[in-house]
Amino acid sequence: MIAKFAVGEAVTVRQAYPPGHVRTPYFIRGHRGVVQEVVGKFANPEELAYGRDGKPALTLYRVQFRQQDVWPGYDGSPKDTAIVDLYENWLEPA
């Protein structure tokens, strides 16, 4: 498996709002995070949702975001993070 991004690499979630079924939460789009794990390749869930074959398979990443970067006015600890599983087609180099 050849992954486009490596553990420790900074990425930005695409800020796109296509119609239909998407697996990327709105709240994380446009934000910068760091790859924590390359999970593996899986069938594309956005295609599977419509009864298609899910090909080509996409690489899934576990990406960590600082809470204070995601939520305006966040007053928790600056060490607080959110970890979101995101497919490669939603990520860009930071």
Predicted segments with their positions:
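Basic/aromatic-rich interaction segments and small domains that mediate binding to polyanionic partners
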Residues: 1-94
